[in-house]
Amino acid sequence: MTNGNGTPPEAAPPPQLNVLAQYTKDLSFENPNAPASLAPQPQQPAINIQINVGAKALAENEYEVTLSIEGKAEGASSLIFSFELQYAGVFRIVNVPQENLHPLVMIECPRLLFPFAREIIATAVRDGGFPPLMLDPVDFVGLYRQNMDRQAAEAQQASPN
Protein backbone atom coordinates (compact mmCIF):
# COMPACT_ATOMS: atom_id res chain seq x y z
CA MET A 1 0.00 0.00 0.00
CA THR A 2 1.29 3.47 -0.85
CA ASN A 3 0.32 6.99 0.11
CA GLY A 4 -0.34 8.08 -3.49
CA ASN A 5 3.17 9.08 -4.52
CA GLY A 6 4.59 5.56 -4.59
CA THR A 7 6.06 5.56 -1.08
CA PRO A 8 4.66 3.50 1.79
CA PRO A 9 2.70 5.44 4.42
CA GLU A 10 4.53 6.28 7.60
CA ALA A 11 3.75 3.97 10.46
CA ALA A 12 1.81 5.44 13.34
CA PRO A 13 4.02 6.14 16.34
CA PRO A 14 3.92 3.31 18.88
CA PRO A 15 1.88 3.65 22.06
CA GLN A 16 3.87 4.79 25.09
CA LEU A 17 3.23 4.44 28.80
CA ASN A 18 5.77 6.17 31.04
CA VAL A 19 5.85 6.25 34.82
CA LEU A 20 6.77 9.82 35.79
CA ALA A 21 6.45 9.42 39.57
CA GLN A 22 5.33 6.97 42.26
CA TYR A 23 4.53 7.93 45.84
CA THR A 24 2.68 7.11 49.02
CA LYS A 25 -0.24 9.52 49.39
CA ASP A 26 -1.50 8.10 52.68
CA LEU A 27 -0.42 5.26 54.95
CA SER A 28 -1.99 4.24 58.23
CA PHE A 29 -1.29 1.19 60.37
CA GLU A 30 -3.11 0.55 63.62
CA ASN A 31 -2.35 -2.04 66.27
CA PRO A 32 -4.96 -0.92 68.82
CA ASN A 33 -4.64 -3.81 71.27
CA ALA A 34 -0.85 -4.05 71.50
CA PRO A 35 0.90 -5.62 73.26
CA ALA A 36 -1.89 -8.17 73.88
CA SER A 37 -2.44 -8.55 70.12
CA LEU A 38 1.18 -9.68 69.71
CA ALA A 39 0.63 -12.82 71.81
CA PRO A 40 0.05 -16.08 69.94
CA GLN A 41 -3.56 -16.33 68.78
CA PRO A 42 -5.58 -19.54 69.30
CA GLN A 43 -6.65 -19.47 65.64
CA GLN A 44 -5.72 -17.77 62.41
CA PRO A 45 -7.16 -14.25 62.19
CA ALA A 46 -9.77 -13.42 59.56
CA ILE A 47 -8.14 -11.06 57.08
CA ASN A 48 -10.30 -8.79 54.94
CA ILE A 49 -8.77 -6.77 52.07
CA GLN A 50 -10.51 -4.11 49.95
CA ILE A 51 -8.87 -2.75 46.78
CA ASN A 52 -9.99 0.19 44.68
CA VAL A 53 -8.50 2.17 41.81
CA GLY A 54 -9.06 5.84 41.08
CA ALA A 55 -7.68 8.06 38.34
CA LYS A 56 -7.74 11.68 37.32
CA ALA A 57 -6.28 13.63 34.44
CA LEU A 58 -3.54 16.06 35.44
CA ALA A 59 -2.63 17.45 32.04
CA GLU A 60 -2.89 16.41 28.44
CA ASN A 61 -1.61 12.82 28.31
CA GLU A 62 -0.80 12.74 32.06
CA TYR A 63 -2.84 10.88 34.66
CA GLU A 64 -2.59 10.28 38.38
CA VAL A 65 -3.68 6.76 39.28
CA THR A 66 -4.28 5.91 42.95
CA LEU A 67 -4.36 2.37 44.23
CA SER A 68 -6.27 2.25 47.53
CA ILE A 69 -5.82 -0.84 49.70
CA GLU A 70 -7.51 -1.27 53.07
CA GLY A 71 -7.28 -4.29 55.27
CA LYS A 72 -7.83 -5.63 58.73
CA ALA A 73 -7.09 -8.76 60.68
CA GLU A 74 -9.62 -9.78 63.30
CA GLY A 75 -9.37 -12.41 65.98
CA ALA A 76 -12.26 -14.15 67.66
CA SER A 77 -13.15 -11.13 69.76
CA SER A 78 -11.10 -8.12 68.68
CA LEU A 79 -9.30 -6.23 65.96
CA ILE A 80 -5.69 -7.37 65.70
CA PHE A 81 -4.48 -4.79 63.20
CA SER A 82 -5.72 -2.62 60.36
CA PHE A 83 -4.09 -0.63 57.58
CA GLU A 84 -4.93 1.81 54.83
CA LEU A 85 -2.66 2.67 51.93
CA GLN A 86 -3.13 5.06 49.05
CA TYR A 87 -0.25 4.54 46.65
CA ALA A 88 -0.21 6.63 43.50
CA GLY A 89 1.68 7.16 40.30
CA VAL A 90 1.75 9.77 37.59
CA PHE A 91 1.72 8.28 34.11
CA ARG A 92 2.26 9.81 30.69
CA ILE A 93 0.28 7.99 28.01
CA VAL A 94 0.65 8.92 24.35
CA ASN A 95 -0.37 7.44 21.01
CA VAL A 96 -3.14 5.33 22.54
CA PRO A 97 -6.56 5.33 20.85
CA GLN A 98 -9.22 7.03 22.96
CA GLU A 99 -11.29 3.83 23.23
CA ASN A 100 -8.30 2.04 24.82
CA LEU A 101 -7.28 4.83 27.19
CA HIS A 102 -9.69 4.14 30.08
CA PRO A 103 -8.88 0.41 30.33
CA LEU A 104 -5.15 1.18 30.08
CA VAL A 105 -5.33 3.71 32.92
CA MET A 106 -7.53 1.53 35.14
CA ILE A 107 -5.83 -1.84 34.49
CA GLU A 108 -2.20 -1.46 33.44
CA CYS A 109 -1.29 1.52 35.62
CA PRO A 110 -2.45 -0.09 38.90
CA ARG A 111 -0.81 -3.34 37.81
CA LEU A 112 2.50 -1.44 37.66
CA LEU A 113 1.89 0.14 41.08
CA PHE A 114 0.76 -3.00 42.90
CA PRO A 115 4.14 -4.65 43.65
CA PHE A 116 5.33 -1.47 45.37
CA ALA A 117 2.11 -1.13 47.39
CA ARG A 118 2.34 -4.81 48.34
CA GLU A 119 5.85 -4.28 49.71
CA ILE A 120 4.80 -1.19 51.70
CA ILE A 121 1.95 -3.15 53.33
CA ALA A 122 4.16 -6.16 54.09
CA THR A 123 6.73 -3.89 55.73
CA ALA A 124 4.13 -1.94 57.74
CA VAL A 125 2.55 -5.14 59.06
CA ARG A 126 5.98 -6.58 59.91
CA ASP A 127 7.00 -3.35 61.64
CA GLY A 128 3.74 -3.59 63.63
CA GLY A 129 5.03 -6.80 65.21
CA PHE A 130 3.38 -9.39 62.95
CA PRO A 131 4.60 -11.64 60.15
CA PRO A 132 4.63 -9.72 56.85
CA LEU A 133 1.28 -9.79 55.07
CA MET A 134 1.98 -10.84 51.48
CA LEU A 135 -1.01 -9.86 49.38
CA ASP A 136 -1.97 -12.19 46.56
CA PRO A 137 -1.74 -10.84 43.02
CA VAL A 138 -4.78 -8.84 41.94
CA ASP A 139 -6.80 -9.45 38.79
CA PHE A 140 -7.11 -5.83 37.68
CA VAL A 141 -8.97 -6.87 34.52
CA GLY A 142 -11.61 -8.58 36.67
CA LEU A 143 -11.75 -5.59 39.02
CA TYR A 144 -12.19 -3.25 36.03
CA ARG A 145 -15.01 -5.37 34.59
CA GLN A 146 -16.70 -5.59 37.99
CA ASN A 147 -16.58 -1.80 38.39
CA MET A 148 -17.85 -1.21 34.84
CA ASP A 149 -20.74 -3.66 35.39
CA ARG A 150 -21.62 -1.93 38.68
CA GLN A 151 -21.57 1.51 37.02
CA ALA A 152 -23.76 0.26 34.17
CA ALA A 153 -26.26 -1.20 36.64
CA GLU A 154 -26.33 2.06 38.63
CA ALA A 155 -26.86 4.07 35.44
CA GLN A 156 -29.68 1.76 34.39
CA GLN A 157 -31.39 2.12 37.77
CA ALA A 158 -31.01 5.91 37.67
CA SER A 159 -32.51 6.31 34.20
CA PRO A 160 -36.31 6.36 33.95
CA ASN A 161 -37.90 3.64 31.83
Curated annotation (Swiss-Prot):
Database matches in HAMAP family: SecB
GO CC, alphabetical: cytoplasm
An example molecular function term from Gene Ontology annotations: unfolded protein binding
Source superkingdom: Bacteria
Organism annotation: Rhodopseudomonas palustris (strain BisA53)
Lineage of origin: Bacteria, Pseudomonadati, Pseudomonadota, Alphaproteobacteria, Hyphomicrobiales
Descriptive protein name: Protein-export protein SecB
Region forming the signal peptide: none
One family name in Pfam for this protein: SecB
Disulfide bridge map: none
Gene3D superfamilies associated with the record: SecB-like (3.10.420.10)
Keyword set, alphabetical order: Chaperone, Cytoplasm, Protein transport, Translocation, Transport
Annotated function: One of the proteins required for the normal export of preproteins out of the cell cytoplasm. It is a molecular chaperone that binds to a subset of precursor proteins, maintaining them in a translocation-competent state. It also specifically binds to its receptor SecA.
Family affiliation: Belongs to the SecB family.
